[in-house]
From Swiss-Prot:
Residues binding [4Fe-4S] cluster 1, per UniProt: C68, C73, C79, S308
Pathway: Protein modification; protein lipoylation via endogenous pathway; protein N(6)-(lipoyl)lysine from octanoyl-[acyl-carrier-protein]: step 2/2
Subcellular location: Cytoplasm
The protein's name in its UniProt record: Lipoyl synthase
PROSITE patterns, per the entry: RADICAL_SAM (PS51918)
InterPro entries: Aldolase_TIM, Elp3/MiaA/NifB-like_rSAM, LIAS_N, Lipoyl_synth, rSAM
Gene: lipA
Family designation: Belongs to the radical SAM superfamily. Lipoyl synthase family.
Binding residues for [4Fe-4S] cluster 2: C94, C98, C101
Domain named Radical SAM core: residues: 80-297
Lineage: Bacteria, Pseudomonadati, Pseudomonadota, Gammaproteobacteria, Alteromonadales
Domain of life: Bacteria
Length: 321
C-alpha cells in the first residue's frame, strides 16, 4: 500500500478528498437514494442582494472569512441581508475531517497576526452590535487557537466598546485548562461549544472529538465564569432518536449549560453523511418544551436553526425557530 501524500500547507481538501481517511467510511450518496427535502425546508431568497454583496465585499477586502460561506450555511442570504455574519478566524482550513461539515480540511497556514485588528475595523464599519466569532479546529497550535480568540475579543472591544461578543469555540483537545486560562483574560459575553450529536454517533460524525471532553469544556468555563451564559448546539437527522437527544439535553443541563440550539442536518454533498430523516417542526417544538422544562433559559429549536442563527435575539431571550 502506498503512503498517503503529505498535506501541503494552505491546500483545501473537500468532499471525497476530505473524508478519505476517517474511521467510519462514507459511501457517496446516489441522487435517487437521497431523501427529498420537505416543504418546510424551502429557503426564501431576499428580493435584493445588495446587502449580501456588501458584506461579501467587506470580508474579501479585509481578507476575513465567514462560517456562513465556508460551511455553506442555508441561512446565509437571510443573515447577510439583515447585516449579520459569523466570523471564522484562524483561516478556512480545519485540521479535523468531520463528514457532516463542509469546511475544508488540510494543513492550515500560520495564523494571521493582523486578523484581530482587521476584524475589529470591519465590525466597526458594519456597525454591528452583536458578533459571533468561531474558528476551525487548530490541533496544530499549542493552545488550540485560544490566544487568537482572546486577541480578537480585545481588539474588537477597543474599537466597539458597547458590542456583545459570542464565541463558538472548538474543543481545545488535550489543552482545555490552558485554553480557558487564556480566555479568562478576555472573556466573551456568551460562551458556545457545540456537541453536534448524541454520543453514539461521535465515531462517524466527529472523528477526533470526545463527548465527555466537550461537556467538560462547557462546565469548566461556567465554573470560572458563573455570570456568563454557556450555550451548545445539536443537529438532528443523523440517525439519532428523540430520546437520545433528550438524554444529551439532560447531560448539558447537568454541566450547567443554559442556552440551546437544535436544528436539522442538511447534507452538503453526496460525499458527506447522508440525511437519515427530516424532522418535522412539531418535533422540534416538543424538544424545545422539554428543554425549557429541565431548565434551559433559552432554547432555539427548528429545522433551520443554526448555532449563530439570530444569535443576538437568542441572547435577548427572544423566540427563534
Amino acid at each position: 500500500m502506498s503512503r498517503p501524500e503529505r498535506l501541503q500547507p494552505g491546500v483545501k481538501l473537500r468532499d471525497a478528498d476530505k473524508v478519505a481517511r476517517i474511521p467510519v467510511k462514507v459511501v457517496p450518496s446516489e441522487r435517487e437514494t437521497m431523501l427529498r427535502k420537505p416543504d418546510w425546508l424551502r429557503v426564501k431568497l431576499p428580493a435584493s442582494s445588495q446587502r449580501i454583496d456588501d458584506i461579501k465585499k467587506a470580508l474579501r477586502k479585509n481578507e476575513l472569512h465567514s462560517v456562513c460561506e465556508e460551511a455553506s450555511c442555508p441561512n446565509l442570504a437571510e443573515c447577510f441581508n439583515h447585516g449579520t455574519a459569523t466570523f471564522m478566524i484562524l483561516g478556512a482550513i480545519c485540521t479535523r475531517r468531520c463528514p457532516f461539515c463542509d469546511v475544508a480540511h488540510g494543513r492550515p497556514l500560520k495564523p494571521d497576526a493582523n486578523e484581530p485588528k482587521k476584524m475589529a475595523q470591519t465590525i466597526k464599519d458594519m456597525k454591528l452590535k452583536y458578533v459571533v466569532i468561531t474558528s476551525v479546529d487548530r490541533d496544530d497550535l499549542r493552545d488550540g487557537g485560544a490566544q487568537h480568540f482572546a486577541d480578537c475579543i480585545r481588539e474588537i472591544r477597543l474599537l466597539n466598546p458597547s458590542i456583545k461578543i459570542e464565541i463558538l469555540v472548538p474543543d481545545f483537545r488535550g489543552r482545555i485548562d490552558a485554553a480557558l486560562d487564556i480566555l479568562a483574560t478576555e472573556p466573551p459575553d456568551v460562551f458556545n461549544h457545540n456537541l453536534e450529536t448524541a454520543p453514539m454517533h461521535y465515531r462517524k460524525a466527529r472523528p477526533g472529538a470526545n463527548y465527555q471532553w466537550s461537556l467538560d469544556l462547557l462546565k469548566k468555563f461556567k465554573e470560572r465564569h458563573p455570570d456568563i451564559p454557556t450555550k451548545s448546539g445539536l443537529m438532528m437527522g443523523l440517525g439519532e432518536t428523540n430520546d437520545q437527544i433528550a438524554e444529551v439535553l439532560k447531560d448539558l443541563r447537568a454541566h450547567n449549560v443554559e442556552m440551546l440550539t437544535l436544528g436539522q442536518y442538511l447534507q452538503p454533498s453526496k460525499f458527506h453523511l447522508r440525511v437519515e430523516r427530516y424532522v418535522p417542526p412539531a418535533e422540534f417544538d416538543e424538544l424545545r418544551e422539554f428543554a425549557e422544562s429541565i431548565g434551559f433559559t433559552h432554547a432555539a429549536c427548528g429545522p433551520m436553526v443554526r448555532s449563530s442563527y439570530h444569535a443576538d435575539l437568542q441572547a435577548q431571550g427572544k423566540e427563534v425557530k
